[in-house]
């Protein structure tokens, strides 16, 4: 989703995220709830760029940091997604291990967990321990389409932000392959 679409269709969600940043009141963990395609992953990446980009008009969208975040290759942004249909404890343990080492350049470290509701209970318990002792330079964005599958204690440690459904009439499909994936 393009940034302008994200701001148009998810104005309230983006306003909450950006206001926290602008007022220097970002929390350490966000739970971004919404169906697939509503922009929660794009919002998490946008906020990662906003946190890491060094330009005055952050995010600039054109510096090396912003481009690496867009291409999922930035060393300070870790992505976790289900392997098969589940996120396992080992994946969360790897995250904790990676984040136990300081950032090389003092930049914030960000992790984005796609489909967090697919974490098994062991993975959720491991993540919970990590969420309970936040590092001021670590930020989490958990995306989900069914937050009720998460432990209540995880939900309570995150700022909940709902991404509303996007009307089908507003979805522009530009690639035939994307059409096949949707249908």
Predicted regions and their residues:
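Single conserved hydrophobic/aromatic residue that forms the stacking wall/gate
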Residues: 171-183
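Short regulatory helix/loop adjacent to the ATP-binding pocket of P-loop NTPases
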Residues: 129-130, 147-157
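A short beta-strand-to-loop transition that corresponds to the Sensor-1 phosphate-sensing loop
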Residues: 115, 142-147
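ATP/adenylate-binding site constellation spanning eukaryotic-like Ser/Thr protein kinases
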Residues: 74, 92, 124, 147, ...
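Conserved catalytic/switch belt of AAA+ P-loop NTPases
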Residues: 125-142
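Residues immediately C-terminal
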Residues: 118-119, 133, 149, 160
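Clamp-loader machinery-focused feature within the broader ASCE/P-loop NTPase space
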Residues: 1-122
């Amino acid at each position: 989703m393009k940034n302008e679409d994200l701001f148009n269709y998810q104005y309230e969600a983006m306003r909450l995220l950006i206001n926290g940043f602008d007022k220097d009141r970002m929390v350490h963990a966000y739970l971004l709830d919404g169906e697939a395609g509503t922009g929660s992953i794009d919002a998490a990446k946008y906020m990662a760029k906003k946190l890491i980009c060094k330009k005055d008009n952050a995010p600039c969208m054109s510096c090396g940091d912003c481009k690496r975040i867009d291409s999922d290759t930035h060393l300070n942004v870790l992505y976790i997604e289900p392997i098969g249909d589940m996120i396992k404890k080992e994946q969360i343990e790897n995250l904790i291990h990676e984040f136990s080492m300081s950032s090389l350049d003092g930049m914030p470290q960000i992790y984005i967990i796609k489909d967090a509701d697919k974490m098994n209970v062991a993975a959720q318990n491991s993540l919970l321990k990590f969420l309970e002792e936040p590092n001021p330079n670590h930020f989490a964005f958990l995306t989900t389409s069914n937050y009720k599958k998460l432990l209540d204690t995880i939900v309570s440690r995150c700022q909940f932000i709902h991404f509303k459904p996007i009307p089908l009439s507003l979805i522009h499909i530009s690639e035939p392959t994307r059409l096949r994936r949707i249908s």
